[in-house]
Amino acid sequence: MTYALAAAAAVVFAVLVGSASAETPYEGRKKCSNCHKSEADSWIKTAHAKAVDSLKANRDKEKNKAMLKAKLDPKKDYVKDKDCIGCHVTGFGVEGGYEITEPDKFLIGVGCESCHGAGPDYRKVHRKAGEAFEKSKKVTPRESLVEAGQEFEFIEKCNVCHLNYEGSPWKGAKKPYTPFTPKVDKKYEFDFEKSVRNNKAMHEHFKLAGTFDGPPTPKFHEEFQKDAKPAEIGKEE
């Protein structure tokens, strides 16, 4: 996934949320980053972290060319455009999510909760399970995270921004459509299987401690964990 792909869905204003996320407020990546330090340090370098930059008026020449191809005004700042901002931030239009009038820096960019769902409920499960594992190596069923609203299948959350264009093969596409389509430029073609393996777009995956066990896991879970490096573990503040 290129930077262009991460910024491709410039006109969709809401991302999909999980089953529990509908009534659970977003809280931003700071809470996640406190414990998942390595993942956070990796994410901040990615295209998803910098997604808002492509909406700013002072974007670079390459991005301005993309704007022209998509028949948008390269001189315009789209950061406050409600039809654009949703795919560049976390939780826009949802309780606790990003607000144009009061932007929270921990909700800027396509952050943790954009993929994993709103975090307050399942974060508590992570904390309790982590304490139990640290104390007695007790393993917690991963299903408990699902019950608390954590998402483990991400493809639809990607599609809602990257495939939301007129004539898209994705059946969920609807107005307002993104103007950044494969017809405008082939670099906007989206392949989930390739993109999810691209560390320039996604954060690097690190070795899990084994706190949770059992289903569900994404189908690429074992592949990523096989060669994953140990993570630097932070502490919840």
Per-range role (PLM):
Residues 1-22:
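N-terminal export/membrane-targeting signals
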Residues 139-140, 144-170:
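Repeat-solenoid scaffold signature
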Residues 121-123, 166-176:
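Substrate-binding/catalytic groove segments of enzymes
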Residues 88, 116, 162:
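Helix-to-catalytic-loop junction in kinase catalytic cores
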Residues 18-107, 119-151, 183-237:
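Sequence context of c-type cytochrome heme-c attachment sites
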Residues 160, 173-188:
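Aromatic- and glycine-enriched pocket-lining scaffold segments that form the walls
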Residues 110-113:
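Cysteine-rich micro-motifs
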